[in-house]
């Protein structure tokens, strides 16, 4: 799994981007990929662990967990 920092996340629209620690390209994240109960959102600068998978417009995050 990769580790990164949330660049931004729009809770109203339910998506944002993660900057991976390995300095690779930013990864799209959709609220449905966030693990946990309750309202699923991320905050700017949250550290997260995630997997990547191919999405309709390129790489996207999957199984996102806050650290």
Curated annotation (Swiss-Prot):
Keyword line: Activator, Cytoplasm, DNA-binding, Transcription, Transcription regulation
Recorded GO MF terms: DNA binding
One GO cellular component, as annotated: cytoplasm
Principal subcellular localization: cytoplasm
Pfam families recorded: CSD
Source superkingdom: Bacteria
CSD domain span: 4-64
SUPFAM superfamilies linked: Nucleic acid-binding proteins
Annotated localization: Cytoplasm
Name of the featured protein: Major cold shock protein
